[in-house]
């Protein structure tokens, strides 16, 4: 009876073999439960399983002292994590893996809930730091890109200026040629008028004077009229 009473009295840190349905007797450690869990899990202990780093609430009937049951339940087993659990309970009984953080909320530590929050805060800080470093990296990457783009734009502008500069003399030369052609056309336009002026005396209908044959006929007619007038004057006498 005294032994059975002892089995029911476990304290935080005791090493045991814990039996769960569907699993062999597993190397485990008793963890102290918080006050909130004591009422809901009366007469039960929070157990941390070595190897798997999982936790469960078990009664005294499913717990067996490790040292007394080591020969009986400590035989090798093919279940995943069992061999690791046997090694941890012997060599590192106070192990606290990453998966054990959830059980730390119900462990012997008086500030279990603060630690995960601190870790989360650290994670956020790390995330922010990483984010800021990423942003800085982006800024650093963007600055050379901007410089390259600006240099590329300057090169393009310089190329455009070089391409435009030979075009401008061509355009000015084209304007000069066009002006010469216009001047030549303007110089050629008065020529037909001058030709017309020069050609008018040669035309028979210009009115400058009759041809020589007509002049001779007129002189003969004038002589005949003068002779006829003389005859008339003579007859009148």
From Swiss-Prot:
Modified residues (Phosphoserine): 132-133, 165, 199, 202, 206, 236
Ranges annotated as biased composition (Basic and acidic residues): 116-128, 135-173, 181-197, 223-237
GO process annotations (BP): cellular response to interleukin-7; chromatin remodeling; negative regulation of neuron apoptotic process; negative regulation of transcription by RNA polymerase II; positive regulation of cell division; positive regulation of transcription by RNA polymerase II; protein localization to nucleus
Keyword Transcription regulation in annotation: yes
Pfam families, alphabetized: PWWP
GO MF term set: DNA-binding transcription repressor activity, RNA polymerase II-specific; growth factor activity; heparin binding; nucleotide binding; RNA polymerase II cis-regulatory region sequence-specific DNA binding; transcription corepressor activity; transcription corepressor binding; tubulin binding
Glycyl lysine isopeptide (Lys-Gly) (interchain with G-Cter in SUMO) crosslink location in chain: 80
SMART domains referenced in this protein's UniProt entry, alphabetically: PWWP
Post-translational modification (record): Sumoylated with SUMO1. Sumoylation prevents binding to chromatin.
Glycyl lysine isopeptide (Lys-Gly) (interchain with G-Cter in SUMO2) crosslink location in chain: 80
Biased composition (Polar residues): 91-106
Function: Acts as a transcriptional repressor. Has mitogenic activity for fibroblasts. Heparin-binding protein.
Protein name (record): Hepatoma-derived growth factor
Species of provenance: Rattus norvegicus
């Amino acid at each position: 009876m005294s032994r059975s009473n002892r089995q029911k009295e476990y304290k935080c840190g005791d090493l045991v073999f814990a039996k769960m349905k569907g699993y062999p007797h597993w190397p485990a450690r008793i963890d102290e439960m918080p006050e909130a869990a004591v009422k809901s899990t009366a007469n039960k202990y929070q157990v941390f399983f070595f190897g798997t780093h999982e936790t469960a609430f078990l009664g005294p009937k499913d717990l067996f002292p490790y040292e007394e049951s080591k020969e009986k339940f400590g035989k090798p087993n093919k279940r995943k994590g069992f061999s690791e659990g046997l090694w941890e309970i012997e060599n590192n009984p106070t192990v606290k893996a990453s998966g054990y953080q959830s059980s730390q909320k119900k462990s012997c530590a008086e500030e279990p809930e603060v630690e995960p929050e601190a870790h989360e805060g650290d994670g956020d800080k790390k995330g922010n730091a990483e984010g800021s470093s990423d942003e800085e990296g982006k800024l650093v990457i963007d600055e050379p890109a901007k410089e390259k783009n600006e240099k590329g734009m300057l090169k393009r502008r310089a190329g455009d200026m070089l391409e435009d500069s030979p075009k401008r003399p061509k355009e000015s030369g084209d304007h000069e040629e066009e002006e010469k052609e216009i001047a030549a056309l303007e110089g050629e336009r008065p020529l037909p008028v001058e030709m017309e002026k020069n050609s008018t005396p040669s035309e028979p209908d210009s009115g400058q004077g009759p041809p020589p044959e007509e002049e001779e006929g007129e002189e003969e007619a004038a002589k005949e009229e003068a002779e006829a007038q003389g005859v008339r004057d003579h007859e009148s006498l």
